[in-house]
């Protein structure tokens, strides 16, 4: 006897995460800090370093380099417009059928920069990964905010001398 699995409804195949991050740093400083955090300064919420390579140009790769031609491909830069836009598409952390689109839009606002973040994924993502993605983005964005604000503070101190 053949069993047929019932396909999940489309609602269960779409994951949307949005965040608004307020940074007390100039637009350019915030954008560079974001690239650094997504790249060589990336780390897991438990503090373990997980450096990534982000080739910040259209078609550039975003991947974890484990050395000796080993690693994990996360995505491609779909669009970049310094310092206001970064879009990445790809499987990200998934080792199963899933495609994601990340969008970072940076907007200058009074006192600094606002980052509007959208992660839309299509595929069967289990609940543990949905929760982990939300927590991971929260942590990564908080680290980027701190990095930008620290950099802006150092630059301001240098100008004051």
Regions flagged by a language model, labelled:
Residues 19-21, 52, 74-79, 100-108:
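Hydrophobic/aromatic beta-strand elements that line small-molecule binding cavities or substrate pockets
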Residues 30-34, 62, 77, 88, ...:
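Hydrophobic pocket/interface hotspot
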Residues 11-13, 54, 69, 94-98, ...:
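A generic structural micro-feature
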Residues 18, 25, 36-73, 83-85, ...:
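Short beta-edge strand/loop motif at the mouth of beta-sheet-based domains
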Residues 1-18:
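Short acidic N-proximal helix/loop "leader" segments that mark the beginning
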Residues 2-3, 121-161:
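A conserved amphipathic terminal alpha-helix motif
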Residues 92-139:
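Beta-strand/loop substructures that line and gate deep hydrophobic ligand-binding cavities in soluble
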Residues 23-29, 78-84, 105-114:
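A short, structured loop/turn motif at beta-sheet edges
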């Amino acid at each position: 006897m053949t069993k047929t699995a019932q396909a999940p409804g489309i609602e269960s195949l779409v994951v949307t995460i949005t965040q608004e991050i307020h940074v007390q740093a100039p637009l350019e400083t915030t954008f560079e800090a974001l690239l650094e955090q997504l790249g060589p300064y990336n780390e897991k919420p438990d503090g373990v370093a997980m450096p990534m390579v982000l080739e910040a140009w259209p078609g550039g790769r975003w991947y974890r380099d484990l050395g000796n031609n080993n690693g994990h491909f996360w995505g491609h830069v779909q669009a970049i417009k310094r310092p206001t836009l970064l879009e990445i598409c790809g499987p990200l952390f998934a080792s199963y059928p899933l495609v994601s689109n990340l969008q970072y839009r940076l907007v200058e606002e009074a006192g600094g920069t606002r980052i509007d973040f959208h992660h839309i994924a299509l595929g069967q993502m289990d609940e543990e990964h949905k929760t982990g993605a939300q927590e991971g983005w929260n942590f990564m964005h908080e680290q980027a905010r701190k990095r930008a604000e620290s950099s802006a503070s150092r630059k301001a101190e240098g100008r004051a001398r």
